[in-house]
C-alpha cells in the first residue's frame, strides 16, 4: 500500500501529525529556505500516495498551480490545507477552481462556526472515501465525529460568512485595522511591554504583535490568560522557548473583545 506523503519542507507545520497518525510517512522536498519544481518532483516515488500543500506558506516554495501540475503528471492527488486561509472570501472559490483534488478548511476561525467542524471539498471519489470514516463505519475517523447540531451550526455560519459583499468585507478589514491601532496605543507604554506594533501584510490579515521585556515570559503569560473567565486563548505550539511575544489576530475576534484582552494584560502586568 502506498503510504508516502510529499510535503515541501518550507511548508512544515504542527498539523502534519494528521498524516503520520494514520500510518503515512512524510518525505520532505527542498529545505527551510524554499523548494524548486525539480526538488518536489524528484521526491516522488512509487510509494507516494499524495502531495500535501499548506496554504499558509502559499507564497513560499513551489506554487499551488505548479504543485497541481506535478500531481496530475504523476497521477497523484494534491491535498490543500487551507484551514485558516479563507479570507478574502474569494479564496474559497479560488481553491475550488484551482484543480486541487481535496481542499480542507476550518469551520471555526474566520468562518466562525463550531471550532471542531471543517469543510472538505474536491473530487467526488475522494470525498466518498473520506465518508467511509464516518458513521455507521468504525474507522479512524470514529473518534472525530461531528454532531448533527454542529453541522447545522457550520452551515449557518458559512451562509453568513458568504453573505458578506466585497464592499462590506473592505469595511470589515478597515475596522480590524482601526481596532488594532487602538490596541497598540493602549499597550505601547504599558510596564513590561517593550514594543507593540500592527502587522498587516494583507488587509484581511491584521495582527498586533506585542513584545515583552526579558523579565516576562510570554509563554507563562499565555497560560495565565487561558485561566481567565472568559478564557483568552494564546496559541503556544509554535512559540519558541525564547520567543517573548504574543500576537492578537483580529479575524478571530468579535468587536469589543480586544478591550477585554487589553484589560487582562494591563491587570497581569501591573
Predicted regions and their residues:
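Conserved PLP-enzyme active-site core in the AAT-like
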Residues: 1-166, 173-174, 184-191, 212, ...
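Active-site glycine- and acidic-residue-rich loops that bind
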Residues: 177
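An exposure/low-complexity boundary signal
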Residues: 5, 269-270
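Flexible glycine/proline-rich
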Residues: 180
